Amino acid sequence: MIHPIGHLPKRIFRLTALVAIFALLLAPNLQAQSDEQREAIQKFGTALQIINFAYVDSVNSPDLVASAIKQMLKDLDPHSAYISKEDVERVNEPLEGSFEGVGVTFQLFNDTILVVSPVPGGPSDKLGIIAGDKIVKIDGVSAVGEKINNEYVMERLRGKKGTTVSVAVKRNGKKDLIDFDIVRDKIPLNSIDATYMAAPGIGYIKLTRFSKTSMDEFHESVRELRQEGMQDLILDLRSNSGGYLNTAVELSDEFLPADKLIVYTEGLHQARENFYSTSTGSFDKEGRVIVLINEASASASEIVSGAIQDWDRGLVVGRRSFGKGLVQRPFRLPDGSMIRLTTARYHTPTGRCIQKPYAEGVEEYFKDFKNRLEHGELVSADSIHFPDSLQYLTPAGRTVYGGGGIMPDVFIPIDSTRFSDYYTDLVRKGVFNDYIMSYLDKNRAEILVKYPTFAAFKAGFVVDEQMYSDFKAKAADAKVVRAADEKYYYPDSDLKLQIKALLARNLWDAEAYFEVINAIDTELSTAVELLQNKKQFSKLQGK
């Protein structure tokens, strides 16, 4: 039955608490709103009341409001977002630099929680839990079987600092289970994955995100590398999706002399704000720098690479970055949820806007990688063309380009082996993981006796033909077979190196992984060669 509006129950026109809250959120100062804005807010409130009181079935008003907010933000730009109360802490965690829990890195192996490594100095490490231990009970309840997944494990092992969780561990060589009562604590979440000497005099730092702890980690990395004789630095920001603006400014400051513009932000409701370098940089007076970027380097990564490029401070090597130059400001909502709303755009010192266009909609925006690949941009610099209006000049007279993202000074085509169907299936079906876990389950102790340090492992360990044959058998069991006519061929030698690198990560840490696998990294080797050829480096800098 359809009721004429005039005959709807009076309760439909009573302002519910939910609508009142929503209206207040959208218009904290209603007098400052235009008539059009006030009418839009009232329209939404009325629509929600009608749905709430007249819809054929019961409705969940908070869910409806959340859905409406999500759609509104989606219509604005690709990066404004709604975050539920339950997800706020999880989303912020990587940038906070820590979380609270027991302090273990784990993987699921044969429906069992396998400790890959305890966090050094963390609560599990202090109690004596070691790599290779299998957690079979949590708080007296079996933690083995098909019900076990990553979410299940994290829900039970993470928790507030000071709370206790009991685990029972099966250890190789021990008949009985070992019980541990672990008092949860703050666990550091590092943003630097690797720090080592890539070549004599050349340091390498891989930064994965711009978090609250990144600068402390960076200073420690620089100190370590200088002790090992570092003069020049390769800063790896590939696939670094960004983080805090202040951290990006502070990192840029490390390389620039005082009073240089690093970045500025500006929006309709936000006046231009300039961010300048200070005189406190640890790398501002000496030492050359190369920044590695790729199509997944975004936001804060683009601020750093853009500032270094615009001031002719170093070289940028790789492929055009993602092109995320929108500033999101968090707004807390009364129920604990959050809006991350775009309030401004980033601009590099020369005035380039980092943000790529998004007028064609969110779906097309996130197809950018596919479009770049199809247009040839990822494999050939000749396929990239910029109109004169997007050209900018640096102080040294070099031409740099706007239009979205940072175009590198030295272009390196994407490694086509990453598109190998065989390699993709090996990863997707978990063949690498299964092989590494089963191999270490049998051989961990023997390897560590023979190679007590990573340096010894790197120099002496070889993935022999028996190991590789076992790996291929594991692949065949998962129905992963290399096609005879494979378009993109992933060499056997590279697969063996990947196995060695993954073993290193499980036996030591992420840094060990990168130090092994980077032996076949074309972008890194190009950066090393440029730093070793001072004449070529200076020429590319315009000096």
Please state what every model-predicted region is.
Residues 55-116, 162-194, 517-528, 536-543:
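Extended, small/polar residue-biased N-terminal targeting/export presequences
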Residues 2, 28-40, 44-61, 84, ...:
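Cleft-lining beta-strand/loop regions that shape enzyme active-site pockets
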Residues 353-354, 358-543:
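Conserved functional hotspot residues or short segments at active or partner-binding sites
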Residues 300, 312, 319, 323-390:
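Polar, glycine-rich mid-to-C-terminal structural blocks
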